[in-house]
Amino acid sequence: MMSKLGVLLIICLLLCPLTAVPQDGDQPADQPAERMQDDISSEHHPFFDPVKRCCKYGWTCWLGCSPCGC
């Protein structure tokens, strides 16, 4: 009985190897460099003032840009 299970296990592993299953390293959360390229930082925000290093208008707080004195 055990030898039949062993043979079945080997056949299953040969047909579907463990490398075909996505590993944890393949997840987007584990790749911070690629995730940072997709993020829109406040420097690229349309209301960002590069001199003051904040947003020009206070009402843009909810748009993802840190406001100037909000």
UniProtKB/Swiss-Prot annotation:
The keyword Secreted applies. Residues 21-51 form a propeptide. One of its GO terms (cellular component) is extracellular region. Residues 1-20 form the signal peptide. Contains 3 disulfide bonds. They are not added, since framework IV presents two different connectivities (I-V, II-III, IV-VI and I-III, II-V, IV-VI). Keywords: Cleavage on pair of basic residues, Disulfide bond, Ion channel impairing toxin, Neurotoxin, Secreted, Signal, Toxin, Voltage-gated sodium channel impairing toxin. InterPro entries: Conotoxin. Its main location: secreted. It holds the Pfam family Conotoxin. The record marks 57 as: Important for binding and activity. The keyword Manganese does not apply. It is found in: Secreted. Expressed by the venom duct. GO terms for molecular function: ion channel inhibitor activity; sodium channel regulator activity; toxin activity. Mu-conotoxins block voltage-gated sodium channels (Nav). Blocks reversibly sodium channels in molluskan neurons, but has no effect on sodium currents in bovine chromaffin cells or in rat brain synaptosomes. Induces paralysis in bivalve mollusks (Mytilus). No effect are observed on fish (Gambusia) and fly larvae (Sarcophaga). Is approximately 6 times more potent than PnIVA in blockade of the sodium current in Lymnaea neurons. The cysteine framework is IV (CC-C-C-C-C). Belongs to the conotoxin M superfamily. This is Mu-conotoxin PnIVB. The lineage of its organism: Eukaryota, Metazoa, Spiralia, Lophotrochozoa, Mollusca.
